Amino acid sequence: MVAQQADELTTKHHPDMIFLHSLSESAESAVKYDLEQLSIASLTMDVDFFIVGEVKGTEAMYLINAAYTGQISAATVHSLSAQAAPEKIVDYALQASGNKYNRAELLKMIADCYHTVINVKDYTVYEVLEIDGWDDVTQSIKYKSLYHL
């Protein structure tokens, strides 16, 4: 299942893929679905994978919670580097958490649940990092570089 605002992640031929798109309120319809609502709806479905195409808001908290409950999940996010991607997702999740979690707790949740961070620029893979655990002293994710262009 892929929840996204724009068609960044697509396939026209895979029979087992479900795509949910956000819908803005317009003059023609008062119906509105944002990525947060789509993420909540997605988590109630019996899906094998939960993917958010371009995290940029409160849906980040649902992505982290889904992963932390054992749901296989992935996301795209715009960031400056592979190491900056989890930080960016945490920035968005902090907006949604209402101070329920702090930055270190959310980063540790990511470190516990995700294994790989890939940085893509201009349709080229620039960097691949393995998440190698959590450093309690520095309160940060430990990485192992697997590939760098």
Regions found by a protein language model. Name each.
Residues 1-111:
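Switch/coupling sub-region of P-loop NTPases
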